[in-house]
Amino acid sequence: MIAGVSAACGLLLAASGVAHAEVEPGGWSSESPGFKVQERGCGEVDDLTFKLTCSTASGDQRAERRYDTYTGGTHQFEGYFRVTSMGGTRISLKQTFNDTDGDAGPYFMLAVERGGRLYAVHGGDTLSNAGTVGATVRVNTVHQVGKEHRTYINGSLKHTVDSPGGSFYDKFGAYRTGSGNGPATVEWSNVKFWRK
């Protein structure tokens, strides 16, 4: 009996070290990249609450976390967001940003319109209509650097785009797109990162 309990405890301990990614399971290691808070224009950050307090439709209006740069490999982001107020529209929620010399700039941007439409800023593809005020939405991005970038909404694959090689980083929060404006408040939770 004691041997059986010891074996069971050993299995539990071994299992607790496994990094369980919500999509595309297998072979992931959890990681905790550092980040910097970015507040510009009327952007305000309070832990995982991100606000654009103005209706300005020009200039740099952002409230975000910018995570450390990665190069090569496969990286998965997961987070849950809830739009708690949306007086504006076309607010970017999650970005994968190219940090490669000569190619730096937004590579993938997930944004929300008033009414709940979630879309890819580059190309305009609709990913979901789940981003309504008050709804909690899970976002996963899987980025195989040099191959492709995949976006999942509530566990379902919704968008795939080819990826160049180089260096990238993740951002999330609330950011006015070129055709957008606030005000808006977005709460994020349960943010996790993995790599393989």
Where in this protein do the model-derived segments appear?
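Secretory/extracellular carbohydrate-interaction modules
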Residues: G43-V45, T49-G115, R195
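Surface-exposed loop/edge segments in extracytoplasmic proteins
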Residues: D103-F108, D125-N129, S156-V161
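Ligand-recognition surfaces built from glycine- and aromatic
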Residues: E22-E24, T69-F81, M86-D99, D162-K196
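Short, aromatic/His-centered strand-loop micro-motif at the edge of beta-sheets
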Residues: V23-E31, R114-N140
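Extracellular glycan-recognition surfaces and repeat-rich motifs
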Residues: W28-T49
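Secretory targeting and sorting signals
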Residues: M1-A21
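Localized edge beta-strand/strand-to-loop motifs within extracellular or lumenal beta-rich domains
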Residues: G134-R150, N154
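Secondary-structure transition/turn motif
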Residues: K51-S58, V121-L127, I153-L157
